Amino acid sequence: MNSESVLEEIVLELYRNKLFKIGEYRLTSGKISPYYIDLRILPSYYDIYSKIIDISLSKLEKLNFDIVVGIESAGIIHASFIACKTHKPVGYVRKKPKQHGTKRLVEGIVADRNVLVVDDVATTGGSLEHAVNAVRSMGGIVEKAFVFVDREEGARERLKRLGVELISLMNIWFIINVLVKHRLIDEQTYYLIKNYLNREKHS
C-alpha cells in the first residue's frame, strides 16, 4: 500500500471515530469553522495513531534535527512519540511562562540545536510562531515545523516569513476530497467548507 492509500485509510478512520466533525466550532483563533479536527484524543486510538506516527517518520527521516519540541498542550504527546521513535531528546513550549520555580517558557535544552517544532494541527500559525520565537529566544535553531494536518488558513505563509518551512502529513483539501470520494459528506457540505477555506485563504 503506497503512502497516499495509507493516508486515505487514516482519513476514513478519523471520520469513523468522529475525530473529524462537521458542524459549527469556535477555534482557538476565535473563528467559527464548519468543521473540527479533534486530534487531542488521537493517541487513545492506538491503531490509527501508530499508522500516523509511522507515516510521519517516513516524511521526517531525511530532516536534520537534534531535538523535537512540542507545543502545549496537544503537541507535547506527539513530539514525545516522534522523539522516542527517532531516538532524539524532547522538549516543549508553554503557552505562558511558569509563574513559579524556574519560570521557563521553554522546557528542554535547545541552545545551539536544530529544533523540530511539532503540533497537531496548523490553522493561522499563531501557536507555531509563538513556539518558534520562544525557541529562538533560547538560542535554538528552527528551520522546520511539523503538523499532522494543515487547515490551509495561512500558517504555511506565516511561518515562511519567519524562515521556517511547515511540513504537514496532509492538508484539509486532501481530507475533504477523500470524504467526497467515499460519499461521506454531501455536496452542500463540500461547498460550505470550500467557501470557508477560500474566504480564510484571502482574509
UniProtKB/Swiss-Prot annotation:
Taxonomic lineage from the root: Archaea, Thermoproteota, Thermoprotei, Desulfurococcales, Desulfurococcaceae
Subunit and interaction comment: Homodimer.
Cofactors required: Mg(2+)
Disulfide pairings: none
Pathway: Pyrimidine metabolism; UMP biosynthesis via de novo pathway; UMP from orotate: step 1/2
Reaction equations catalysed: orotidine 5'-phosphate + diphosphate = orotate + 5-phospho-alpha-D-ribose 1-diphosphate
One BP annotation, GO: pyrimidine nucleobase biosynthetic process
Organism of provenance: Staphylothermus marinus (strain ATCC 43588 / DSM 3639 / JCM 9404 / F1)
Name listed for the protein in its UniProt record: Orotate phosphoribosyltransferase
